[in-house]
């Protein structure tokens, strides 16, 4: 009924991505986290690492970041971290949300067929991601997942510097010496084949190792040093309903995970 009233009265209206861009992003340095999986956790971690380093970033994402107790925050710093979704912007605007977000630094961690309700096939999704990459300015940065052939191929579309991350041997940002225990994951991050920082992460699984790598590459581009990255990751509390530990029952640890972590 509200929508019909707006249309009947010819009132001005805009999609949420348009409002975010026009009200917040023109004067910000936009950090866009995109890909089929891992967006929410990575965006939350990027915002937390920047906060730990004293940057006071803004954040908009699709889950509740435990460190902030919310899915959004408006900081006083110039950095704006935003989860970049390829889903359409509104019923009247079928372009992908992330095309509105003015990316200065963008991560594309992986790329698979998704959102079958609006995309006919993988080619249609590829097109939106190619458009995103082409929006990054020449002085910006694209960070792609080396373990995803589809994401890695996007480097050829970029007109800006490109870095890669993953467990693959050729990744610019690579995790090695990975060990997993009951309390989390430990590993060494190498940058261009050289030791960069040792990580103790409360997060579990290879996907979360990749999320940490992506976040590390992003905040390193903002000038955050290795010590703050290590301490920030160690104090990261994760995202609600993303591989969230609910406790133990009869010796079995229970986790809640809503969707892509």
Task: Briefly describe each language-model feature range.
Residues 1-16, 21-22, 26-28, 52-55, ...:
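Acidic, Mg2+-coordinating active-site environments of NTP-dependent enzymes
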Residues 33-43, 109, 215, 260-261:
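Conserved adenylation A10 loop of the ANL superfamily
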Residues 39-45, 67-69, 89-91, 209-210:
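Short glycine/serine/threonine-rich phosphate/pyrophosphate-binding segments
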Residues 72-75, 98-100, 134-137:
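Conserved catalytic network of the ASCE P-loop NTPase/AAA+ motor domain
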Residues 78-79, 104:
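Conserved acidic residues
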Residues 79-88, 254-256:
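Switch II (G3) loop of P-loop NTPases
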Residues 88-102:
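Switch II of P-loop NTPase G domains
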């Amino acid at each position: 009924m509200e929508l019909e009233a707006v249309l009947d009265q010819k009132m001005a209206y805009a999609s949420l991505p348009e409002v975010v861009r026009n009200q917040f992003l023109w004067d910000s340095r936009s950090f866009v986290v995109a890909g089929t999986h891992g967006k929410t956790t990575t965006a939350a971690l990027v915002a937390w690492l920047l906060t730990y380093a004293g940057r006071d970033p803004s954040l908009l994402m699709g889950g509740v970041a435990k460190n902030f107790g919310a899915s959004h925050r408006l900081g006083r710093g110039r950095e704006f971290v935003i989860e970049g979704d390829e889903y359409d912007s509104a019923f009247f605007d079928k372009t992908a949300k992330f095309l509105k977000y003015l990316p200065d630094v963008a991560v594309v961690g992986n790329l698979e067929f998704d959102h079958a309700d609006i995309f006919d096939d993988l080619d249609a999704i590829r097109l939106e991601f190619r458009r995103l990459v082409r929006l990054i300015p020449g002085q910006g940065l694209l960070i792609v997942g080396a373990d995803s052939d589809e994401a890695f191929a996007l480097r050829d579309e970029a007109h800006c510097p490109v870095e890669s991350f993953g467990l693959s041997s050729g990744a610019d940002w690579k995790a090695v010496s990975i060990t997993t225990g009951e309390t989390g994951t430990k590993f060494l991050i190498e940058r261009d084949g050289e030791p960069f920082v040792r990580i103790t992460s409360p997060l579990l699984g290879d996907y979360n190792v990749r999320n940490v790598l992506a976040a590390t590459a992003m905040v390193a581009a903002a000038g955050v040093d290795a010590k703050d990255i290590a301490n920030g990751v160690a104090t990261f509390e994760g995202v609600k309903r993303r591989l969230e530990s609910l406790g133990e029952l009869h010796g079995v640890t229970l986790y809640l995970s809503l969707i892509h972590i």
